[in-house]
């Protein structure tokens, strides 16, 4: 998606290394979503695998309120994206984010791969403990 958004047309990419976010590790964009994305998305970013465990753990441990959210590896990028965006002045300006903004984060899966989820949760919990 990132490459296609950047060049403004469907673009296939060769995947050099698979991501732990298996559902997002695709070489091309599906045609139906592309019809929507090409005319409505102005900004796009890529999330590294290393950032996933901490977000999975923060969501699971209720760091953002009273709710505990079981968010798998393809849901955590929503949290990472808003965190990165709010901590970068240029991105905040580009997205017109401020204290009055309302942001909807969509998580597209829970713990669909329980072994991977537990591994990410354990690693992320360790990161939280180590500060």
Region annotations inferred by a language model:
Residues 1-39, 92-126:
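Glycine-rich phosphate/pyrophosphate-binding loop at beta-loop-alpha junctions
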Residues 30-96:
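Active-site-adjacent helical/loop segments in soluble small-molecule enzymes
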């Amino acid at each position: 998606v990132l490459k296609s958004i950047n060049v403004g047309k469907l673009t296939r990419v060769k995947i050099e290394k698979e991501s732990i976010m298996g559902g997002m590790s695709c070489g091309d964009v599906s045609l139906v979503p592309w019809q929507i994305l090409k005319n409505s998305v102005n900004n796009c970013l890529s999330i590294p695998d290393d950032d996933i465990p901490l977000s999975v753990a923060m969501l699971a441990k209720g760091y953002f309120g009273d709710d505990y959210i079981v968010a798998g590896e393809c849901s955590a990028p929503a949290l990472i994206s808003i965190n990165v965006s709010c901590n970068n002045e240029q991105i905040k300006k580009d997205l017109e984010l401020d204290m009055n903004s309302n942001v909807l984060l969509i998580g597209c899966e829970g713990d669909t791969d329980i072994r991977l989820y537990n591994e990410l949760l354990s690693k992320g919990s360790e990161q939280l403990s180590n500060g």
